[in-house]
Structures are given as structure tokens and as C-alpha cells.
Amino acid sequence: MMMMAMANDKVRVIITDGQKKVRIPTGLRMLVRRACIAVLREEKFEGNAEVCVTFVDNEEIHRLNKEFREKDSATDVLSFPLGENGIYDVNPDTGAKQLGDVVISLERAEEQAAEFGHSLQREVCYLTVHSMLHLLGYDHMEPDEKAVMRKKEESVMSLIGLTRS
């Protein structure tokens, strides 16, 4: 399992590769970091933040989906927020607000990228943006919530230069 921590003045993104089935393209980790930062900027998030992003395979995300959501299937991304209503635990070592964990199945992302006709990088960044919005409290259970979330996703993807082609 490979870990890579990346930080700037306000955002620490810890990326862990917990799978061996999909080769991580050059530059993907930097794009994921940019996606996390773009969401926080777009949402005008105040203070230092910390988020963990883990890449897994379909088998592992299936296990997590079953354990935590009682859904017996693989999915593309899971979000595990550590805060609620804008209140987050603070890392005592860094003072950063701990937003939570993003878990992405690179296998599923690769399948979806092929299905939608775009790159794995774009798909993983979209899933990162989607999950980051969940960590900040957004949801898509109701049609109006879904519309708001989709608009925010498109706005952030545009900011990082990964619009739909």
C-alpha cells in the first residue's frame, strides 16, 4: 500500500493506493489534489483542511458498501464525512479540520471512463469532486438537491479544466 501526502497552505490531501488492478496514470494524484482544493475554494471553505483519498478495487469497495451502507454491490465512490453542519474534528498536530475519507474504486472508474468516452483522470476527478461535496454536507437524494449538486460538480470540473467533451 503506497501513501502520498500533499499539502499547501490550507489543504492537506493524503492519497493512498490500496489496489493493484489499475495502474495510476501519471499526474492523477496531482489532479485529485487540485479537485479537492477547487471544491473547497468554490465553497469558500475557511481554515485549514485535511482529507484522505483512498484508491481501492471493486472487491474492497463492495465490502465497504455492504458494511457501511448495507448495499451488496460494488460502487464507484464512497464518502465518509467526519463533520456535520460545518463542524469538524481538528487534527491536534496540524490544526486542520478533518473533512473525512473519499474511497474510489479505480476499477469502476476505469469502466465508467470507457463507458462515457473520457479519460480515467477525468472520471476519478469527477468522483473526487462528487465525494468532496458529500463531505461538505451536500446530497442528491431529492431532485432539487441533485440539481444543486450537479451544478456545483460541473462548476468545479470547469475550474480544473475537465469539462465534458
Give the ranges of each region predicted by the language model:
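An acidic/histidine-cluster motif and surrounding catalytic segment
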Residues: 1-125, 135-165
